[in-house]
Amino acid sequence: MRSLTLAALLLCSLLLVFHTSAAEELQAQEGHLMIPGDTDTALETVDDERLFECTFECDIKKEGKPCKPKGCKCDDKDNKDHKKCSGGWRCKLKLCLKI
């Protein structure tokens, strides 16, 4: 019983740390305004909530289009497909993350 409680406590702590770091990253991104003449024109503007959702669910669609580029797969063991990711998407821990 104690080990189950300890495991649950550790899991909650880990989720809190991850959520806090993700929230700080999103807050930092809010200050960055995209100008049409920027070099980031290939990036599709995604609102903060969708960006957070797309970090965990690579197949979520926004306005009928996938959030991540076509061909960006992170489920391979060696992450060899990370070179196919573009537009700010990278493979981290077998997840497609928007950087």
Curated annotation (Swiss-Prot):
Pfam families: Toxin_20. Residues 24-50 form a propeptide. Keywords: Disulfide bond, Secreted, Signal, Toxin. SUPFAM superfamilies: omega toxin-like. One of its GO terms (cellular component) is extracellular region. The keyword Isomerase does not apply. Expressed by the venom gland. InterPro entries: Hwtx-2-like. One of its GO terms (molecular function) is toxin activity. It is found in: Secreted. Disulfide bonds join C54-C67, C58-C91, C72-C74, C85-C96. Belongs to the neurotoxin 12 (Hwtx-2) family. 04 (lasiotoxin) subfamily. Toxin that causes irreversible contractile paralysis into adult Aedes aegypti resulting in 100% mortality after 24 hours. This is U1-theraphotoxin-Lsp1b. It comes from Lasiodora sp. (strain IBSP 8539) (Brazilian salmon pink birdeater). The lineage of its organism: Eukaryota, Metazoa, Ecdysozoa, Arthropoda, Chelicerata.
